[in-house]
Amino acid sequence: MILVVGLGNIGVEYENTRHNVGFMLIDLLLKESNFTNLTNSKFKGELFKIGSSLLLLKPSTYMNNSGLSVKAVNDFYKCERMIVIHDDIDINLGALRFKKGGSSGGHNGLKSIDALCGNDYERVRIGVGKGENVISHVLDKFKPEEEITLSKVLEHTKKALLELIEKDDLSAISSKYSLKA
């Protein structure tokens, strides 16, 4: 099994915020796929299955406790691979980066996952830029002019993610799909 985790916060007030780009990408994948809904309270999130070996997870624990949901799914399904999609304030809106392992970079969702599951997983980092106040910036909604860039980046990221899942070659995918902004 491959587990793809999109990080975000639940609730209408968080829809279309910078912190929710992981949720947005999962929603984009679901919109274009036949899936089985495996959501169960024990998983602490929305869980979907595509085909025989791909799980998509949107934790419902809020960002700072995302690891609780990821651990519950990993413990139950014994996933061989995990890919986490998240916002990154250290890269500009429109940028896309890939990496495996390493530090959380101060991202509380990643800190939670690292604490409960370790940090040996692939990461898809979607740039959202850095505002004056980090917390309010990541919880702000995208401006209309930013939504155009975001839409293009999410579509590009979807293609990259699908190829990463299929080919399992992070270096090649990073070379082919990374974006600078």
UniProtKB/Swiss-Prot annotation:
TRNA binds at residues 14, 62, 64, 108. It catalyses: an N-acyl-L-alpha-aminoacyl-tRNA + H2O = an N-acyl-L-amino acid + a tRNA + H(+). Keywords: Cytoplasm, Hydrolase, RNA-binding, tRNA-binding. The active site is at residue 19. It holds the Pfam family Pept_tRNA_hydro. One of its GO terms (molecular function) is peptidyl-tRNA hydrolase activity. It is found in: Cytoplasm. Its EC number is 3.1.1.29. GO terms for cellular component: cytoplasm. The record marks 87 as: Stabilizes the basic form of H active site to accept a proton. One of its GO terms (biological process) is protein quality control for misfolded or incompletely synthesized proteins. Hydrolyzes ribosome-free peptidyl-tRNAs (with 1 or more amino acids incorporated), which drop off the ribosome during protein synthesis, or as a result of ribosome stalling. Belongs to the PTH family. Monomer. HAMAP family: Pept_tRNA_hydro_bact. This is Peptidyl-tRNA hydrolase.
